Structures are given as C-alpha cells and as structure tokens.
Amino acid sequence: MNEVKFLSVKLAEKLDLSAIASVFNVTRTVKWQEVLLIDHELVELVLKRPVEKREVYLYSFGVATFVDFTEAEIRDFLAFIAQIQTVNYDDFAMYYDHYEAVVGDYGEWIVTPTLTIPFRPMIKHIAEAVAKSTGFMHTEAHLNRVMDSVEPMITKLAAGRSRITKTTMRIVRETIVFKFKLTRNLKLFERPSDAEFDNISREGYDWLSNHFELDERYQINAQKIETLKRMVYQYYHFNQNRKVRSLYIFEVFLLMLFPLVRMLSDRLPLMLAWLLRS
C-alpha cells in the first residue's frame, strides 16, 4: 500500500495549451480540449533524469496538477514552463490544493474502507477534481475582491452621494472584463457529463466532488456572478438616470431662460438708445 500525491497550483490566468503542446511535440486531436497531459516520458525529458509515474495535467484555466512530484521536481518543471509562457509565482504561492490517494497492493484506489476503485483510470479524474478546487479558490478570492469594490460604489450612487469619476469608470470597466472572464471560466468548472464515466468511476468522482464541495462551490460562484451582473446593470441604470436628470435640469433652465431672453430682446433697442445718448 502506498500514497500517490496530487498537487494542483495556479500558474496563470490562462495556459496556452497549444503553445505548450507544440514545444513537447504533442498533437492535440481536439483543439478545444481544456486539458493537456504531459506523461512521464515527457516529464523525464524536462527533468533530465528518470522518474516513475510522474504526470502533469495542464488546464486552460491556468491550473496544473502534478502527480507524485517532489517539490524540487515541481520547481524544475515550472522553470521549463516559464520559458514558454509567464508563470505567476504569487498565485502559485497562494492558490493550491492537494489530495493523497491511498493505493492498495493490487492497484486499487482505497477511497473509503467500503469503497475501492481501480486507480489508474481514475488518475485523470482525481487530477481534475483537485484542479477545479484550486481554480475555485482563485475565482472565489478575486470575485469577493471585485464585489467588495463595486458594492459600496453602487450604494453611494443610489443615494446620490457619489460622482461618476475616472476611478468609478475604471472599477466598472475592470468589473465588466472580470465578469466575462468568470462567466467563461465557470463553464470549465461544470460537472463532467455521464458519458465520461462508467458506474464505478462515477461513484469515485462523486466522492471527490463531495470531498472538495465542487457542486456547492459552483452554485455559490454562479450566484455571485449573477449578483455582479446585477451590480453592473444598476450602475448603468443609475448612470442613465443621472444623464436623464441632467437633461431635464438643462431643459428647465432653458425654459426659464426664454422669457428672460424675450424680455431683454424687447428692451434691447431702448437700452441701446439710452447708451448712445449717454
């Protein structure tokens, strides 16, 4: 019996899987697939030493899952990836998750004392579950920060206690961009279709999903994104109302100005005559 360690880390906002695949000379049969497997033979080429059962799963949403790597091996692999695209080491240090799979002498994953599943077919599913947990961690933190910035601004606008400044516009612009990124990435975190599993592997993935609370976190993030959308709509609503109100005030000003202009125009000849006599 032994433990196989899965470590997922956030490397970038988005990983360019096509660029990485071309460096490794890996043919991606389906370009839109959101995961790229670097098997142990390719890992050996990067680390320049023999390694057993090391694999890396790279996901387009910027997360990598290392299977049974040591810390030194992870550092060496990241140094190689950094030559292909920028690695955000700040995110790497902040957003990560892990899981240790207990594997029996006959190659079975001992999920619980009453549930065992063949380990090898489940590796990709375990890697995906840990990667999604890490991705959620990053999304949750950024989503909370954005909402903390936007909510007070919307409240002040609603109360008429805030002007639409360059800072306000910048926050809203960043919020809109972030909202679209979240909406796109959240689709990648959706539950896999039943076609990807047989009955046994489905049971294993269900256990992983419960362990990392993936379904609950997906729903919470989806609800927060909807709240963020409503906040942006409120901003446009208040902004539009403010423009309409400004036009109304200007219209009232013009209506008040017309009688004055007419009065002055009627008396203008008399005023000119008086000035000339003076």
Go through the PLM ranges and name each one:
Residues 20, 24, 77, 81, ...:
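Generic structural signal of hydrophobic/aromatic residues within well-ordered alpha-helices
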Residues 272-278:
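Membrane-interfacial helical/loop segments at transmembrane boundaries in membrane proteins
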